[in-house]
């Protein structure tokens, strides 16, 4: 596929290779560790920002999922009062709560969207360089198509996030804060009520506020979760322990693979999100690692979920 200089602006070439995908030491859905091969591709240096998304909306008039009323057919048991445009917003609690119930810190806020990240009355002023949030999978895919790009597969994303450090726990090595230096925007303290802000941020941070990985990519860890195009499976599908048979450019394109979970909208397929966010903490969500993965319903928009794009084609000087 041929590419243009404008299309590749602020993108980094990720050389292809084979790596060990997954992890055996953390959550069950990350297993098994297995070899995967990916071809080289271009990836956005940072998550799509509010400013970049604003230019897309200005050019197309696009309206995000969070800006549209919910379809009652998708939520047959939902309160009709909640079928209005809006999105999920995180609220820090006043003290310790039951971590088994996410409703203690998440609330569906009518009027919350990418322009109004905390709901009506918030305008996101001064956040042009922050990752855009409150974008559902459909919104991310629409932006990618407009930009002449695509969303990454889960394998591409994890390979890129590792930055050439195959097998390391984090994108920068095996120590979370080497020499006491914070390497990503995550939660420090007791979630969801005590945020010590050792990293300097309570919410999202401007892209590039923390060091890049070995491929020159920033914010592959923390800040915001990122959509990938793969449907979620409870464990790695098509995995093999044989290096001779490493899947080549694998992708999960079947919605049937994504599983069904209880709750409103549970019949909707789920896509893999990667990277963790500023809300991930050792006491609750130890998912600020390349191998970590989670399934998210395709209509979900939240205050900690964004995306970045890829281009599959020729590398620098035809590499």
Task: List PLM regions with ranges.
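Acidic-aromatic/histidine active-site loop/patch
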Residues: 49
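Short capping motifs at secondary-structure boundaries
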Residues: 41, 56-65, 147, 315
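A short N-terminal beta-strand-loop micro-motif at the entrance of redox/enzyme domains
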Residues: 35-41
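Functional-site microenvironments in short loops/helix caps that host divalent-cation chemistry
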Residues: 13-14, 20, 25, 69-290, ...
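Short, structured beta-strand segments at or near domain termini in extracellular proteins/domains
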Residues: 303-317
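An anion-binding catalytic pocket shared by soluble metabolic enzymes
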Residues: 44
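GGW-centered surface loops in extracellular recognition modules
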Residues: 5-13
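C-terminal, low-complexity/hydrophilic appendages and adjacent surface loops
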Residues: 28-31
């Amino acid at each position: 596929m041929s590419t243009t200089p404008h299309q590749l602006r602020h993108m980094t070439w990720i050389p292809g290779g084979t790596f060990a995908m997954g992890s055996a030491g953390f959550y069950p859905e990350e297993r098994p560790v297995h070899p995967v091969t990916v071809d080289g591709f271009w990836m956005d240096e940072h998550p799509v920002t509010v400013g970049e998304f604003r230019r897309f909306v200005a050019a197309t008039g696009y309206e995000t999922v969070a800006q549209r009323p919910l379809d009652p057919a998708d939520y047959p048991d939902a309160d009709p009062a909640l079928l209005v445009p809006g999105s999920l917003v995180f609220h820090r609690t006043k003290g310790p709560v039951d971590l088994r119930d996410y409703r203690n810190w998440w609330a569906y806020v009518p009027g919350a969207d990418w322009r109004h990240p905390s709901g009506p009355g918030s305008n996101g002023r001064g956040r042009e360089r922050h990752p855009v949030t409150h974008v559902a999978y459909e919104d991310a895919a629409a932006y990618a198509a407009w930009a002449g790009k695509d969303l990454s597969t889960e394998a591409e994303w994890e390979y890129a996030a590792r930055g050439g450090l195959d097998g390391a726990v984090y994108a920068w090595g095996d120590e979370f804060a080497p020499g006491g230096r914070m390497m990503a925007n995550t939660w420090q303290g007791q979630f969801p009520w005590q945020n010590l802000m050792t990293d300097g941020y309570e919410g999202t941070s401007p892209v590039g506020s923390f060091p890049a990985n070995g491929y020159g990519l920033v914010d592959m860890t923390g800040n915001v979760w990122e959509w990938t195009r793969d449907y979620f499976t409870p464990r790695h599908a098509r995995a093999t322990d044989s290096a001779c048979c490493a899947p080549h450019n694998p992708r999960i394109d079947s919605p049937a693979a994504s599983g069904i979970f209880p709750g409103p909208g549970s019949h909707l397929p789920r896509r893999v999100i990667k990277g963790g966010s500023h809300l991930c903490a050792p006491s609750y969500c130890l998912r600020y690692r390349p191998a970590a993965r989670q399934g998210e319903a395709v209509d979900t928009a939240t205050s900690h979920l964004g995306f970045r794009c890829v281009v599959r084609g020729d590398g620098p000087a035809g590499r």
